[in-house]
Each structure stands twice: as structure tokens, then as C-alpha cells.
Amino acid sequence: LSAPIRRGQFDPSHIDLRNLLSKLSIKALSEDSVNISIKRLGFDEQSGFSLNRLQFKFEANRQQARLSDFKIQLPHSRIEIKPIIATLPDTLSAEHFYDQTRFSLQITKSLINPSDIAAFIPVLEKINTPILISMHLTGTPNNLYFHTFDFNFGKEDIIAHSQISVKNITNPQKRDILCDPITLNASSSGLTDIASKLPFLTEEQCKTISRLGTIHFTGNISSQNKNLTACGTLKTDLGSVHS
């Protein structure tokens, strides 16, 4: 608590909620059964983060858990998740939970404005262009497979489509991410707009990105032990590269 407050950033040591609104219903809460409805939760936090509305219904017993009616509204964002049903392991130890709890999750056309979450990721503060995201994933908390992942920045300024596998999520040393296949299209104006709003890029780096013009990439991207590898064909206004 003696640490100085980090203004403009979420600080877990100095949480300050204002304009708190909440409405919830607890129908069951025991070792064998849970039935909770958050009908509305909203607040403003000193970091600048505002939660306009969070709502969901959570039901669970020893065999399965169900999350439904899940919606999040931020000042310029809205996220909706289709009902999730998770099958639980017989033994709820941490290892069994992460490796044996199976579920399916779908997000359809949710809108996210990066500046809404700048309190957690400060570099997004100046990016006000909306992102449309859709995905369908299945798996366990430790191993996920995205059957579809669609990303649309602005008015199709940057578009990405991919199938993604993420393995060993709980073990950073063994974590493995593979996007295969992935297709990425980015317009010159879209890249220039983002680059100009990222504080860690120098003016010269922004000019270099601008000179690339329109970008098209097809192939795969993998990440393991902090090593990022891309294989495929990259086409820009300056030429093409194949690896």
C-alpha cells in the first residue's frame, strides 16, 4: 500500500471503484450446487477503466458447469459469449481441472475498442479504431484449439483469419502456440494509422512501415520458448518474400 499510485494505469495495490452499481441473485451456493446470476455490475475505476455493464448466469454441480447470458459493455465495446457448458473431472485438483475440464466457447462479432482497455495495456491509449472479433474454440484450460479466429480492424484495414492451437498454457517454459494456416491482409492506411499511435515506435520506424504499403501474408506463425517463427509468403508494395 506504500507504493505510489500509477495514474492512468490499473494498479492492483490501489483499487478505487466509483459509481458502483450491482444487482445479483444467489439461488444456490454449496459444495454440490451453485446458481448465481449477475444481472448487472458496473463501475468506474481510478485508472480510467469503466465497466458499463457485466451480466451472466452461472450454474454448476459436481459434473458440469454452465455459463450463459454473458455480456460485457464498455464505453465503446461490447462482447457477447454464447452459452458455455464445461464437463468437470471427477477430482477437482488443479492438475485435473486444467487438463480434464472440457468446454466449447463461441464469440460472434464482438466489438472491442482498444482504448477501452488502455488502463491494462497503456500502449493502446490512442488507438480508437474498433476491432471486430469472432472465434470458436474447444479444449481444456491447458490446451485450446481455435477452429476459427477472425479479426477485422477498422473498415477492413487489417484482416486476419486463422486456426490456432495453444498447448501447455499453464507452463510458460513448454507453452506452444501455432497459427496454421493464417491469412493476413493489411492496407497501407491501416498500418500507418496504428504505427503512428504506438509510442514505442520511432518516427523512422513509422516511415519504414508506411513504405511497405499493402501487406498480404499466408502461411503459419509459431511461438515457443519466446521464439517467434513465421513461414509462408509475404507480399508488399516493395516486393515478395517466401520462406
Region locations from a protein language model:
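Extended amphipathic, helix-rich lipid-handling scaffolds
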Residues: 1-153, 170-242
